[in-house]
Amino acid sequence: MDSETHITIRNISKNSVDFVLTNTSLAVANSLRRVVLAEIPTVAIDLVEINVNTSVMPDEFLAHRLGMIPLDSSNIDEPPPVGLEYTRNCDCDQYCPKCSVELFLNAKCTGEGTMEIYARDLVVSSNSSLGHPILADPKSRGPLICKLRKEQEISLRCIAKKGIAKEHAKWSPTSAVAFEYDPWNKLQHTDYWFENDADAEWPKSKNADWEEPPREGEPFNFQEEPRRFYMDVESVGSIPPNEIMVQGLRILQEKLAVLVRDLDEEQPTQLSANELNMEENAEMNWSPYQNGEENTW
């Protein structure tokens, strides 16, 4: 029986990748999902300096919308000037071209109609593609930022920085990461609620075509673990979906390598009762409140 982990790509597009992960455990599949969601670095607007804002949009709402605009994060892990450093690792005081990208937005409505401001109207100071707003196609204007009426104006400067979604969701390269296992429910991990017929009232997913259906009355093992997972990753556009998975696997490997190294270097020491100064008949009050008195250990 093959014990090596395999990845079979079923479908890949500009914004999503659908694949099958086999010969692995539920823990590994979920770890990969969590890494892809929160550990892959991207660039996003982190600071907004508003000079003028006479629109109906409050400053904090405007800053929040700007922060959630997906920005091109290709090659962000490369050394500057191709990529970016984390601000916390940079030698500068606050931000600099090595750890940030500047974007500007200046707009004023002079006509009688409504002027719509989109992500495409953001001007990036750098010559590289890093930090540019993601557009679905050349004709697209990107997400709507705000609307201006006559004589209303906004003028601001944005500082985009490198980060991960563990710090804030705006740095997440994905909009959704999901996986399914055992589409026929052979392991009986799911109890279906139904009125008459469970098969008729619970349609099978497309993943059921990749497995043999169970025979009627087929026995099952409660302790059996799933070994095949159907994963679907949807990108926000800042990083291609195939690159998201490559980076996710690399980051997961690095985390496991650090864990193994630390376990090898530091062996846990077992302390005796004497070393802990714990006497067998020591009087301890384990009540968390001590009748209103201060705890003393």
Swiss-Prot record:
Q: Name one Pfam family in it.
A: RNA_pol_A_bac
**Which BP terms from GO are recorded?**
transcription by RNA polymerase II
**Which PROSITE patterns does UniProt cross-reference here?**
RNA_POL_D_30KD (PS00446)
Q: Could you list this entry's UniProt keywords, alphabetically sorted.
A: DNA-directed RNA polymerase, Nucleus, Transcription
GO molecular function annotations of the record: DNA binding; DNA-directed RNA polymerase activity; protein dimerization activity
Q: Specify where it is mainly localized.
A: nucleus
Where found, per UniProt? Answer: Nucleus
Renumbered residue ranges of the record's region Disordered: 270-297
Q: Under the cellular component aspect of Gene Ontology, which terms does the record hold?
A: chromatin; cytosol; nucleus; RNA polymerase II, core complex; RNA polymerase II, holoenzyme
Which portions of the chain have biased composition (kind: Polar residues)? 287-297
PANTHER family given for it?
DNA-DIRECTED RNA POLYMERASE (PTHR11800), DNA-DIRECTED RNA POLYMERASE II SUBUNIT RPB3 (PTHR11800:SF2)
Q: Which family does it belong to?
A: Belongs to the archaeal Rpo3/eukaryotic RPB3 RNA polymerase subunit family.
Query: Quaternary arrangement and interactors, per the entry?
Result: Component of the RNA polymerase II (Pol II) complex consisting of 12 subunits.
Q: What does this protein do?
A: DNA-dependent RNA polymerase catalyzes the transcription of DNA into RNA using the four ribonucleoside triphosphates as substrates. Component of RNA polymerase II which synthesizes mRNA precursors and many functional non-coding RNAs. Pol II is the central component of the basal RNA polymerase II transcription machinery. It is composed of mobile elements that move relative to each other. RPB3 is part of the core element with the central large cleft and the clamp element that moves to open and close the cleft.
Q: HAMAP family attached here? A: RNApol_arch_Rpo3
- Name of the protein in question: DNA-directed RNA polymerase II subunit RPB3
